[in-house]
C-alpha cells in the first residue's frame, strides 16, 4: 500500500486539533452557507416587510453585497403591492432594520457589481426621506466613476435615477448624453434608448435630436406592438424637445390604439397631455380613451385619482359625463391639495366650464395655497380665471401682491416675462417704475418669445393707463422702443434658420409689433434658401399667423412643396396651404402647387381627422380650388357622422369654429361649383347663428345717415342685410338703370333693429327680382382684420365673400377703415363725396 505523504498527515492532524480546541468556531465555519443562494431563497419567501426586516436583523452580520442588493429589491417589490405607497414608504423608511440595511449598503457599495449598484440607488431614492441622502450621493458618485463601462440598459436606469433627482442639466447627465451620442450607431435596444432620450432631452443639440429621431424610426419595427412604455417614452421625448414629428407620433399612436384596453388612467392621462401639447390630433384614440375613461368614473373615489380623471376626461366628455364629473368634483373640492386645485382649474379652462359654484370652491383652495405656487403656475391661475370670467377683488389683490414681490426679486428673463404677463392680465394691470426697471434689466438676455410677451403686456398697460397716467405712459412708450431695439438686434444677429425656428415655435405672429414683424420677415427672407421639406410646415404656420404678405417667402414655400413633395409628410399639407388661403395669394405655379399638394394627400383622406379635412377644404375654397375627390370625401353621410362624433369631444369654441367652416365650405361649393350638385344643408345652423346679430353701433349709424343723405332717404338703404346663403352685408341699396336709387318701401327698417331676410328664396339668383337694368349694391366696410398688415391687400375670406356677393348679383363696393379714417376723408363733406363717387361713379373699391 502506498504511504501517505508526511505533509498531508500533518495537515489533517492540525485540523483535528483545531476542531478539538475551538469547537464553536468549527461549528460556525461548518454551518455558514458556502453560497449566497439559500439566503436569497429565504428573502424571496418573505411576504411582507416585517418578515424582511426580521430576516435582515437575523443575518445582518453575514449579508454580502449581493444579498444587500437583493434585500433592497425585495423591499421595493413588496412596496409596489401596497395601495398607499406614500404611507407605506414612510413606515419602511422609519424602521430600524431599514437603517441597518442602509448602513450595510454604505459599507459595501464599492463591492457591488454595476447592476446591483444602480438597483440599490433606485430603491434607496424611492424610500429616501432626506433631500440629500448620503448613501444616494455615494452611490451616484460611484456610478459616475464606472459610467463608461455601463451597457445601454444600465445607463438608461441610471439616467432615470438622476432624472428622479431633477439633475437634467447636471454635468453627469451631460456625460451620459455624450456616451449615447458616441454609441448611437451601434445601439439596437430601443427600449433603453427611448428612456435615455427623455432624460437627456434638455441637453441635446438640434442635430443630435434629429439623429435620435432617425435612429428611433430605424429601430421602431424591432419592438413588439405591445411595447406601450417605449411608445410613451418616444412621445414624451418629442414633447420635451417640442418636435411634432408626424411619422413617429403616428407609429406611437398605432401602438396606443392596439393596446388601449390595457392602458390605465395614468397612461391615458399622459398620452392625452402629450397630444395636447404637440397639437397632435388622433380622433380614433380620443374616442377610445373617452370610452375607457368614462368607465372609470365610478371607480375613482379618491381625490388624487379623480382629479387625474377629471383632467383627462373633462375636455373630451359628453354633456352628461361633464355634469357627473363636475358634481363629484364639487363634493371632493374641499379635500384638494394646491397642486390638484390648479389641475382642476386648468381642466375647467379646457372645458370652457364657467360653473360658478365649482370655480368658487376651487379658487378658495387656490387662495389658501397661493404663496406656494411658482411664477409659471401663478400665470396659469391668472390666465384661467380671466378666461372663466372670475371676479373676486380679494383674490386678485393677493395675487397681484404676490406677483409683484416675485418680480422685484427675479433676474431670470423667462421668469420676469411670465410675471409681467400675469400682471398685465389682472383687472388692474398697472406696473410701477420698479417693475419697468426690472424688465429693462433683463432685456439684453431676452429671446424673441420674451420680447414678444413683454411687448404685448406693455401695450395692455398703455391701453389701460393712457387716460390718467400720462407720465407712466411715456415711460411705457420708451420701454416699447427698447423692446423694438433689442428685438431687431436679436433678429439681425441670427445666423441659422434652425435656431430661429426654435424661437418661432411658440410665437404667434399677430402679437408681434409692426416694426419687429417687418424685421422678422426680412430675416426669414435672408434664410429663404434654407427652407426645405423638414421646416416648410413650421415656416408656413408662422406666416399664417402674421397676416403679413411676403410673396418671396410664399413663392419659396410653394416651390419647396412642388419639388420636395415626396419627402413632406401628407399631414403637413394643410399647414403649407393655409398661408396662401389666409393671405389670398396665388404663387406663379398655382395650379401645379395646389394640385401636387392635394394629390399627395388624396390617399390619406380616409384617416385624416375630420375637422382638419374641413379646414383644408375651406382653405382651398378661399383660393377658388375645388378638388372633386376631396369634396366627395367631405360631403357624404359617413364622413359627416364621423365629424358629428368629433364635435362632441372638441371644446365648445373649437366645435363652433369647425361647424362654421363647414357651413362656409358648403356655401362656397353651392355658389361656385353648382355642377357638383352638393346640397345646401345649413339653413337651420345659419338662422341660429344669426340670432346674435344686434343693432348698429355708433359708427354704423353715422354711415347709415350719410348713405341715406346720399341716396335720398332712409328708405333707400338697408343695414345688416342677410343674403341668400346668409352672407351679412353691411349696407345695401338698389339703383335703377338710370343710376337712380330705388326705395325699399314697406321693407324699410328702423335704426338698430334686426333686419328681415330680404328675399324669400335661398336658391334663386337675385337678378330676376330686380326691375330691368337695375343693380343691387353691397357696401362693405373692411376693418384691419380683413386686410394684410403690411399692404392694403384683401385677405382670403374677404375676397371669397366678394366673389359670392357678385355671383348673387351684387355690385360690391369695399371701403377699408384706413381709407375711411384717412386725412383725405376727415370731414363729413369729403366722406359724402367719396360715397357718391363709389355708388354713382366707376369706383368699386378703394383697395
From Swiss-Prot:
GO MF annotations in UniProt: RNA binding
Keywords noted in UniProt: Acetylation, Mitochondrion, Transit peptide
The record's subcellular location field reads: Mitochondrion
What protein does this entry describe? FAST kinase domain-containing protein 1, mitochondrial
- This protein's gene is called FASTKD1
Q: Which residues carry this modification: N6-acetyllysine?
A: 360
Which source organism does the UniProt entry give? Homo sapiens (Human)
What the entry says about domains is:
The RAP domain is essential to regulate MT-ND3 mRNA levels.
Q: What does this protein do?
A: Involved in the down-regulation of mitochondrial MT-ND3 mRNA levels which leads to decreased respiratory complex I abundance and activity.
Biological process GO terms, please?
mitochondrial RNA metabolic process; mitochondrial RNA processing; regulation of mitochondrial mRNA stability
Tissue specificity annotation = Expression detected in spleen, thymus, testis, ovary, colon, heart, smooth muscle, kidney, brain, lung, liver and white adipose tissue with highest expression in heart.
- One GO cellular component from the entry? ribonucleoprotein granule
Which ranges carry the RAP domain? Answer: 777-837
- InterPro entries the record matches: FAST_2 (IPR013579), FAST_kinase (IPR050870), FAST_Leu-rich (IPR010622), RAP (IPR013584)
Record family assignment: Belongs to the FAST kinase family.
Q: What is the lineage of its organism?
A: Eukaryota, Metazoa, Chordata, Craniata, Vertebrata
Amino acid at each position: 500500500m502506498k504511504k501517505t505523504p508526511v505533509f498531508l498527515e500533518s495537515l489533517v492532524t492540525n485540523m483535528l486539533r483545531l476542531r478539538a480546541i475551538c469547537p464553536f468556531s468549527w461549528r460556525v465555519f461548518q454551518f455558514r452557507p458556502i453560497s449566497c443562494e439559500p439566503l436569497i431563497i429565504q428573502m424571496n419567501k418573505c411576504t411582507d416587510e416585517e418578515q424582511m426586516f426580521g430576516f435582515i436583523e437575523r443575518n445582518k452580520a453575514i449579508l454580502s453585497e449581493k444579498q444587500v442588493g437583493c434585500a433592497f429589491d425585495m423591499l421595493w417589490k413588496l412596496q409596489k403591492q401596497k395601495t398607499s405607497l406614500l404611507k407605506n414608504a414612510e413606515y419602511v423608511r422609519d424602521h430600524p432594520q431599514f437603517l441597518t440595511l442602509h448602513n450595510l449598503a454604505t459599507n459595501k457599495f464599492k463591492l457591488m457589481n454595476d447592476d446591483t449598484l444602480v438597483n440599490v440607488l433606485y430603491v434607496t431614492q424611492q424610500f429616501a426621506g432626506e433631500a440629500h441622502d448620503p448613501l444616494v450621493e455615494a452611490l451616484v458618485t460611484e456610478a459616475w466613476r464606472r459610467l463608461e463601462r455601463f451597457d445601454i440598459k444600465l445607463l438608461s436606469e441610471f439616467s432615470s435615477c438622476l432624472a428622479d433627482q431633477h439633475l437634467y442639466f447636471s454635468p453627469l447627465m451631460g456625460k451620459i448624453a455624450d456616451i449615447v451620442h458616441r454609441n448611437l450607431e451601434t445601439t439596437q435596444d430601443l427600449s433603453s434608448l427611448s428612456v435615455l432620450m427623455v432624460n437627456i432631452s434638455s441637453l441635446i443639440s438640434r442635430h443630435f435630436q434629429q439623429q435620435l429621431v432617425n435612429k428611433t424610426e430605424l429601430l421602431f419595427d424591432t419592438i413588439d406592438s405591445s411595447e406601450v412604455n417605449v411608445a410613451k417614452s418616444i412621445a414624451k421625448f418629442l414633447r420635451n424637445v417640442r418636435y411634432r414629428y408626424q411619422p413617429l407620433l403616428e407609429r406611437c399612436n398605432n401602438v396606443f390604439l392596439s393596446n388601449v384596453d390595457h392602458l390605465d388612467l395614468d397612461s391615458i392621462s399622459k398620452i392625452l397631455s402629450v397630444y395636447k401639447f404637440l397639437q397632435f390630433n388622433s380622433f380614433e384614440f380620443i374616442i377610445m380613451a373617452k370610452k375607457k375613461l368614462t368607465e372609470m368614473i365610478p371607480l375613482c373615489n379618491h381625490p388624487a385619482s379623480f382629479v387625474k380623471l377629471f383632467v383627462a376626461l373633462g375636455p373630451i366628455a359628453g354633456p352628461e359625463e361633464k355634469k357627473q364629473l363636475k358634481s363629484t368634483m364639487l363634493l371632493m373640492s374641499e379635500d384638494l391639495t394646491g397642486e390638484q386645485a390648479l389641475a382642476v382649474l386648468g381642466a375647467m379652462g379646457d372645458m370652457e366650464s364657467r360653473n360658478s359654484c365649482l370655480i368658487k370652491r376651487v379658487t378658495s383652495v387656490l387662495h389658501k395655497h397661493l404663496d406656494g405656487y411658482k411664477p409659471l403656475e401663478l400665470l396659469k391661475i391668472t390666465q384661467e380665471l380671466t378666461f372663466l370670467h372670475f371676479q373676486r377683488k380679494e383674490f386678485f389683490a393677493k395675487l397681484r401682491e404676490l406677483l409683484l414681490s416675485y418680480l422685484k426679486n427675479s433676474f431670470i428673463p423667462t421668469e420676469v416675462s411670465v410675471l409681467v404677463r400675469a400682471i398685465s392680465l389682472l383687472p388692474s394691470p398697472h406696473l410701477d417704475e420698479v417693475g419697468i426697471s426690472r424688465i429693462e434689466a433683463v432685456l439684453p438676455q431676452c429671446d424673441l418669445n420674451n420680447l414678444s410677451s413683454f411687448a404685448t403686456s406693455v401695450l395692455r398697460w398703455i391701453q389701460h393707463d393712457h387716460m390718467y397716467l400720462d407720465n407712466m405712459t411715456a415711460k411705457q412708450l420708451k420701454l416699447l422702443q427698447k423692446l423694438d431695439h433689442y428685438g431687431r438686434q436679436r433678429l439681425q444677429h441670427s445666423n441659422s434658420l434652425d435656431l430661429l425656428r426654435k424661437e418661432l415655435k411658440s410665437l404667434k405672429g399677430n402679437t408681434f409689433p409692426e416694426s419687429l414683424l417687418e424685421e422678422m420677415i426680412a430675416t426669414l427672407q435672408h434664410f429663404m434658401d434654407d427652407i426645405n421639406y423638414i421646416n416648410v410646415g413650421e415656416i408656413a404656420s408662422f406666416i399664417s399667423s402674421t397676416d403679413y404678405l411676403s410673396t418671396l417667402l410664399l413663392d419659396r414655400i410653394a416651390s419647396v412643396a412642388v419639388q420636395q413633395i415626396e419627402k413632406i409628410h401628407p399631414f403637413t399639407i394643410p399647414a403649407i396651404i393655409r398661408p396662401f388661403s389666409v393671405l389670398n395669394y396665388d404663387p406663379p405655379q398655382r395650379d401645379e402647387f395646389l394640385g401636387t399638394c392635394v394629390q399627395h394627400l388624396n390617399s390619406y383622406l380616409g384617416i385624416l381627422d375630420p375637422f382638419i379635412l374641413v379646414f383644408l377644404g375651406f382653405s382651398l375654397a378661399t383660393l377658388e380650388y375645388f378638388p372633386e375627390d376631396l369634396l366627395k370625401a367631405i360631403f357624404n353621410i359617413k364622413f359627416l357622422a364621423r365629424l358629428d362624433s368629433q364635435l362632441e369631444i372638441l371644446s365648445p369654441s373649437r366645435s363652433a369654429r369647425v361647424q362654421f367652416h363647414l357651413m362656409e365650405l358648403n356655401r362656397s361649393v353651392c355658389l361656385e361649383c353648382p355642377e357638383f350638385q352638393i346640397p345646401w344643408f345649413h339653413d337651420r345652423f345659419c338662422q341660429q347663428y344669426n340670432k346674435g346679430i344686434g343693432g348698429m353701433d355708433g359708427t354704423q349709424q353715422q354711415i347709415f345717415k350719410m348713405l341715406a343723405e346720399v341716396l335720398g332717404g332712409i328708405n333707400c338703404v338697408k343695414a345688416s342685410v342677410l343674403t341668400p346663403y346668409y352672407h351679412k352685408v353691411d349696407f345695401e341699396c338698389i339703383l335703377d338703370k338710370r343710376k337712380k336709387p330705388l326705395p325699399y318701401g314697406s321693407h324699410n327698417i328702423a335704426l338698430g333693429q334686426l333686419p328681415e331676410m330680404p328675399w324669400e328664396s335661398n336658391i334663386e339668383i337675385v337678378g330676376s327680382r330686380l326691375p330691368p337694368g337695375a343693380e343691387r349694391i353691397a357696401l362693405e366696410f373692411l376693418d384691419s382684420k380683413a386686410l394684410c398688415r403690411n399692404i392694403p391687400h384683401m385677405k382670403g375670406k374677404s375676397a371669397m365673400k366678394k366673389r359670392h356677393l357678385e355671383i348673387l348679383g351684387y355690385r360690391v363696393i369695399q371701403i377699408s377703415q384706413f381709407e375711411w379714417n384717412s386725412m383725405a376723408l376727415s370731414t363729413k363733406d369729403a366722406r359724402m363725396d367719396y360715397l357718391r363717387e363709389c355708388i354713382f361713379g366707376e369706383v368699386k373699391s378703394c383697395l
